Amino acid sequence: MFSISVVITIGGLPGSGTTTMARRLAEHYGLKHVYAGKIFREMAEERGMDLEEFSKVAEDNPDIDLEIDRRQREAAEEGDVILEGRLAAFVAAGELDHVKGPDLATLKIWLKAPLEVRAERVAKREGIDVEEARRRIQEREKSELKRYKEIYGVDPTDLSLYDLVLDTSRWSEDETFSILKAAIDPLLEREDP
């Protein structure tokens, strides 16, 4: 399909637009979409728990995060994929002890937006009020930050690993998509990135 193996990572905090952009980009470029959040949600559902409950369980069970990472690294090694998740760039870059290896990423993207904007998006998506969405986001972020620091010794909000950081509150969904395509297209045209 492409002259290179394409591995694009998209990370961001809840409500920043990562899933929307990852889906659209995967469809546009004909890439697989491997989504850490979906894997995590499926694991929670299998145990009959909501995300908050399962996040608490995951704090004491690093095997949950390690399994998600292994699946993402395998997908990166296969190539032609968009990896979505807060640690996707770390996984693709081979930066974590249990997934050491060469940096497989073609492009590492971090999407961000202010908490209030993200809370409004999550509230709309999940059919809850904004205050509840804000509370859930803050709890989830606190839980994830704790897990990631304890399990991996990394701070997923350290943006130095990323090639592109974009505030999605400044543009519409279509404009954000266009900006990301403008960053990706030249990389896919090169024979040797």
Swiss-Prot record:
One GO CC annotation, please? cytoplasm
Q: Which GO terms describe its biological process?
A: pyrimidine nucleotide metabolic process
- Name the domain of life this protein comes from: Archaea
Localization per record: Cytoplasm
Q: Which UniProt keywords apply?
A: ATP-binding, Cytoplasm, Kinase, Nucleotide-binding, Transferase
- An example of a Pfam family matching this protein is Cytidylate_kin2
Where ATP binds, per the record, is at G12, L13, P14, G15, S16, G17, T18, T19, T20
Please tell me whether the keyword ATP-binding is annotated for this protein: yes
Enumerate the GO terms in the molecular function aspect. Answer: ATP binding; CMP kinase activity; dCMP kinase activity
What is catalysed by this protein? Answer: CMP + ATP = CDP + ADP; dCMP + ATP = dCDP + ADP
Family to which the UniProt record says this protein belongs: Belongs to the cytidylate kinase family. Type 2 subfamily.
Instruction: Check the record and name the NCBIfam families matching this protein.
Output: cyt_kin_arch (TIGR02173)
Any idea what this protein is called?
Cytidylate kinase
Which organism does this record belong to? Methanopyrus kandleri (strain AV19 / DSM 6324 / JCM 9639 / NBRC 100938)
Which taxonomic lineage is given here?
Archaea, Methanobacteriati, Methanobacteriota, Methanomada group, Methanopyri
Tell me the name of the encoding gene: cmk
